[in-house]
Amino acid sequence: MSRVCQVTGKRPAVGNNRSHANNATKRRFLPNLHTHRFWVESEKRFVSLRVSAKGMRIIDKRGVEVVLAELRASGVKV
């Protein structure tokens, strides 16, 4: 399972760890992903989405029905 938010599209970013001596070593910054079940009232069922914390905020603000409609329109199977 890839580490990508289904709502925002956030994915791991690449950067550097920096030591006290300012040495750089490669690292990945992972998105804050959670598998979360959302109740969809119109379908009378739960839908599981892998979303970041920002994705959950978007769903809270706009509503799960609207976000699901956009996901399905873009070709995501939900």
UniProtKB/Swiss-Prot annotation:
Q: Name one GO biological process term.
A: translation
Question: Does the record carry Ribosomal protein as a key word?
Answer: yes
Region Disordered, residue ranges: 1-24
- What keywords tag this UniProt record? Ribonucleoprotein, Ribosomal protein
Record flagged with keyword NAD: no
Pfam families for this protein:
Ribosomal_L28
Name the family the entry cites. Belongs to the bacterial ribosomal protein bL28 family.
Query: What is the protein's given name?
Result: Large ribosomal subunit protein bL28
**SUPFAM superfamilies in the record:** L28p-like
Q: Name one GO molecular function term.
A: structural constituent of ribosome
Which species does this protein come from?
Aeromonas hydrophila subsp. hydrophila (strain ATCC 7966 / DSM 30187 / BCRC 13018 / CCUG 14551 / JCM 1027 / KCTC 2358 / NCIMB 9240 / NCTC 8049)
